Amino acid sequence: CAFLMPFVAKAQYEILPFGDVIRTPIKEKKYTDVEGTPYLIDKWSKGKVTLKNGKRYQYDSLRYNLMDDKLVFIDAGKMMHFAEPVAEFEINDGKTGNLIYKNGLPAVDALNTSSFFQIINRDKIGLYKKVSKSITESKQYGSAVVNKTFNTTYSYYSLKNGIFSKIVPNKKSILALFENKENQLNEYLKSQKVDFKNDADLEKIFTYLNK
């Protein structure tokens, strides 16, 4: 018989039977002629999922497809995606740990409220990261062979007072967000070795300035 097992973390997750999830089988698109992977992490990874209806699940087989911005999972050897809308998910990248993604943010550029963003910091003034993939084509001089590769791009967005804006993370853009905290930022940069291209460093800066 089906049973529930509690999993205690920052929020309460439950390991529910797969039959509880409304899922839709999908046929995986094979990019056999493209070098690289369309996924955030090529292997199946453990993670947690929160649906918009509030239900939470823990999985051993999640992958995030960056080409179509969809979260997929394996059930009985078949690839599925969630028929019910996903609000947030957490996935282990096997390197830095768990990465948390959410949607429902304001539409910006060519992105809409269904687009997933990695949460770098979600304090009052937040920072989010969009990871995207596209296919680029190239060929060597004198060759008719076209080489296709997946190209990964990273974009950062700030959320302040309901306004979602693309930024380049650096001292100038951060000061523009935290207008009255130039002294605090200067003190922080003097005492800490900061790499503005490092997500962990950016998270710490935003946490510090949001105090």
Give names to the regions the model predicted.
Residues 141-204, 211:
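A short, solvent-exposed beta-edge/loop patch
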Residues 1-14, 205:
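Bacterial Sec-dependent N-terminal signal peptides
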Residues 40, 47-166:
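Aromatic-patch recognition
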Residues 35, 43, 66, 198:
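Solvent-exposed, flexible loop/coil residues
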Residues 10-38:
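Sec-dependent signal peptide cleavage junction
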